[in-house]
Amino acid sequence: PTRGNDCGMFHYLTEAGIPFSRLHDVGGYFGGGRFVDIPNLFPDPDADPADPASYRFGFTDLLVTELMKSGTEPFFRLGVTIENEWAVYAARIWPPRDSLAWAKICEGVIRHYTEGWADGFHYPIRYWEIWNEPDNVPDPMENPMWRGSAEQFFELYATASTYLKEKFPHLKIGGYGSCGFYGVTGGNVPTYAATSPRFDYFRTFFDDFLAYVKAHNCPLDFFSWHSY
């Protein structure tokens, strides 16, 4: 939406036949403070995930409803938006204190939009993505998306994906919105796709993630990455 809650341009989605819209960086410059992100939907991390009163769905309800009216299915990212001011203060990009509690919050979000829970909806939203770009920077203290180690993210993914897939076996649970594979060589990758320590980390993170998922038998219905 523009100017906070204006969805007047969404008709272009219909006219262009856009099938999906990924819900990330929503509602203003790099995300705003109202839409989609788990801290926006569930502002008090100590509240009860089973209590509808713990959630603030209003802004995201508007967004999702207008997308569905436009014939565009949300590709729902569960997590937070980028914090480009991390050097001043990193607010929401730390690993959740309790991975299972976080997964239960995500369960409430999914039930609200697909099962009508908490005065919600029965929308056919199929894809639920855990986090975004936890591999953004090798040093966690300089990472604008994930202020934790790779292992901490793998544990969060394992806990959340396993829990959510048990609750919603018919939905697609995956992740993690990788930065991409700029450092890959060979095949059809152009020679100017030079590597760097950061790009190498993208690949290392990916390899270690897949190894962890396999070792722990975690659900991975899809893997998402970016092609900047």
PLM segments and residue spans:
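Mature N-terminal, pre-catalytic/accessory segment of carbohydrate-active enzymes
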Residues: P1-P19, H24
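Substrate-binding cleft and catalytic face of glycoside hydrolase catalytic domains
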Residues: A16-Y228
